[in-house]
Amino acid sequence: MILVLDFGSQYTQLIARRLRESGIYTEIVPFFESIENIQKKAPKGLILSGGPASVYAKDAYKPSGKIFDLNVPILGICYGMQYLVDFFGGVVVGANEQEFGKAVLEIAQNSVIFEGVKIKSLVWMSHMDKVIELPKGFTTLAKSPNSPHCAIENGKIFGLQFHPEVVQSEEGGKILENFALLVCGCEKTWGMQHFAQREIARLKEKIANAKVLCAVSGGVDSTVVATLLHRAIKDNLIAVFVDHGLLRKNEKERVQAMFKDLQIPLNTIDAKGIFLSKLKGVSEPELKRKIIGETFIEVFEKEAKKHHLKGKIEFLAQGTLYPDVIESVSVKGPSKVIKTHHNVGGLPEWMDFKLIEPLRELFKDEARLLGKELGVSQDFLMHHPFPGPGLAVRILGEVSESKIKRLQEADFIFIEELKKANLYDKVWQAFCVLLNVNSVGVMGDNRTYENAICLRAVNASDGMTASFSFLEHSFLEKVSNRITNEVSGINRVVYDITSKPPGTIEWE
C-alpha cells in the first residue's frame, strides 16, 4: 500500500486514482496525520503531495519529521519535493519565472524511477517556487527550461517538481508506477473483483443475521451499495425507493426493472402527492431543498418503522465514497457551503442504527467498476449524475405537476438526441432547466407567450470543475426544433455556455 500525505493540492486525489488504476492500493491522509496512525497502516512507500503554500513561509505545512524514521521510500511532488529539499538543508526560493502548464522534461541521469520513460516528454507544471540548491547527497535526475532540478534523488528519497498524476504529464502514470512497483516493492493486487470478494465476506461477518435498511435513489452509488449488500445478506436487506414525483421521465420504471433484473426486492413508496403539496407556493432554492430533505426523512421514517416492527433493523447503509471521507479531514478546513446536499442525514433518534458504508474506500469511477463486476448493466452505470432533490432544482421558481411534465418531456428529448448522435457518453452531464420566464413567440399565425427552457451539457472529470460542452449548432437546432414542436408550453430553447467556476453545474 502507498500512503499519500495531502498538503492541500487540487490534484491530490488524482495521485491515488492513478495508482489504483495501475492495481496499486493507495490511501490519502492529511499531512498532519500522526506517526502512530501512519505506522499502523504499514505503507510500503509515502508520497508527499503538492500544495498551495511555500516551504519558507511561517505557516508552511510540515509533517512529522519522524516519517523519515519509517525506513520506507518517499516521493515528493511539487510542494512535496520542495519540503524535502528544505528539510534536508537545500534552498527553495520564489521563482522569477513561475511555471504553470505544459513544459518539456529532459532526463539527465538514469534512475529506476525513469525506467522505460522517454528521455524527453511533456509534463504539467504548477508552481511559484523553485529549488536553486540541492541538499548534500541529492543528485539531479531531470530538468525543464525553467527548473534546473526538476527531478531529484537521494537513495530511496525522490522529488518531482512537476505533477505526474495529471493526464497532461505524458509519462506520469509510468513514473508513479515505477515508484510503487520498482522502488517500494508493491504488487498489483487492487481491483474490483478482489474488493467485491473481500467486502462481501466482511459484510457477512459484520451483519450476520441482522437487517439492513438501504435508501435507493436510483443513482449509481445507492444501487451498487444495495447490490453488494444483497450479495452478502440476501433478504435481510430492506431496499426502499421513495418516488417523490420529481424524477426524470420513466425513471421509476427504469429503477424497478433494474432491481428486478438483479433479483433484489425493492419497496417502492409513491409519495408524489406529499412532496408536491409541501412544495406548493415555494420558489426559493434552499427552501425547496430543505422541504424535500425533511419530507424524505418523514416518508422514509414511516416506511422504516413498518419494517422495524416486523423485525429489528440494526444497520443503515449509505453510499459514502472515498472523496467524502478525504474531505471530512481536509487540510483546508471546512469550506463555505454553496448548496446544501440532500441526504438521509438528520434521521430521528429512534433510528439508532449502526452505519454501514461499503463504498467508503472507492472513488466514483471505482464504484462504477464495482457495479459492473456485480452485474449492474453498463447503461445504468453510465447514467449522468442526478441531484437528490430531482427536477425541483431544475425548475426555477415554484414547482407544479404541469411544470414537471413539461421538463420531463424536454429533458427526455435532449437525452434521446444525445444518445442517437453518440454524444451521451462523451459529455459528463446533460439536462434541461425550465426557466421561470416566459417569452413571446409565433406558432403558425398565432402569437404565443410561453416558457423558455435551457439546455445544459458539461465536460468534467469529477464535477469539482466543469466546462460547457461544444455541441454542434446543427445538433442544437435539431433538439430545439423537437422540443418546441413536441412539448406543449415551450416556445424558446437556449444553451448554457457557462463553465464552473464561475457558475455551478446545476442552476439551483
UniProtKB/Swiss-Prot annotation:
Pfam families: GATase (PF00117), GMP_synt_C (PF00958), NAD_synthase (PF02540). Residues 1-189 form the Glutamine amidotransferase type-1 domain. InterPro entries: Class_I_gatase-like (IPR029062), GATASE (IPR017926), GMP_synth_C (IPR001674), GMP_synth_GATase (IPR004739), GMP_synthase (IPR022955), GMPS_ATP_PPase_dom (IPR025777), NAD/GMP_synthase (IPR022310), Rossmann-like_a/b/a_fold (IPR014729). Gene3D superfamilies: 3.30.300.10, 3.40.50.880, HUPs (3.40.50.620). Its EC number is 6.3.5.2. Keywords: ATP-binding, Glutamine amidotransferase, GMP biosynthesis, Ligase, Nucleotide-binding, Purine biosynthesis. Signal peptide: none annotated. CDD domains: GATase1_GMP_Synthase (cd01742), GMP_synthase_C (cd01997). SUPFAM superfamilies: Adenine nucleotide alpha hydrolases-like, Class I glutamine amidotransferase-like, GMP synthetase C-terminal dimerisation domain. ATP binds at residues 217-223. The keyword DNA damage does not apply. Residues 190-383 form the GMPS ATP-PPase domain. One of its GO terms (molecular function) is ATP binding. Pathway: Purine metabolism; GMP biosynthesis; GMP from XMP (L-Gln route): step 1/1. It catalyses: XMP + L-glutamine + ATP + H2O = GMP + L-glutamate + AMP + diphosphate + 2 H(+). GO terms for cellular component: cytosol. The keyword ATP-binding applies. The active site is at residues 78, 163, 165. Catalyzes the synthesis of GMP from XMP. Homodimer. This is GMP synthase [glutamine-hydrolyzing]. It comes from Helicobacter pylori (strain G27).
